[in-house]
Amino acid sequence: MHEPLISGGAVRRLWVGETELYRQHLLRLDAESRRSRFGGAVSDAFIERYAEPSALRDAVIYGFFVDGVLRGAAELRLLARAGEAEAALSVERVWQSCGVGTALLERVLLAAGNRQVKHLHMLCLAENRRLQQLARKFDAELSFRSGSVVGDVKAPRPTPISMVRELMADGTDLATAMLDVPTQPAKRLEHSNGSPERRTRERRYERLMLVDNWR
């Protein structure tokens, strides 16, 4: 689902071969945004380790792109307890309070429900009013725990329609990523055998799908 958003931006899924885009986005976060995302001050070295492909293998990530640059992201991780998952959002300062978090969380909830998740947990600092307001928008139950707030959002139940929606969205997202134009509709390439465009597309596909990412 290549969804148009504010100022020509769009939300789509990130694939395993695009972890470098996620790393660069996290490194661009200012000090306050980093603290909100990770629950405390973190260094560049911490982010470098956090965004290693091996560390993100179990995550499903959606991104908000503007002119091909990742400006916001939502990360979904299944928990050991059946039916539970956690989500974390990050948005670069200039794009905050612009509806980016809402668009990202909508995609996360669709993916969570289709993975049999019943409860989606979102942890934030007590002073992070913006994320708490976002969670309330999705009817979250908030509980306060020693300086932190946990939002519990009920994920929608999976249906044949929701499964088809995600499959179609993933297909469009992958095609967009292959063409390397994240904020533009996928354009048709020449289909002549051995064309430079086709070889470039095939190489990009191989890079995007380095490991199985179809969870």
Report residues per predicted region.
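A short beta-loop-alpha structural element at the N-terminal edge
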Residues: G9-Q24
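Short alpha-helical
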Residues: G17-L21, A82, A126-R130
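A short, internal acetyl-CoA/4′-phosphopantetheine-binding micro-motif in the GNAT/acyltransferase core
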Residues: A88-S97, L125
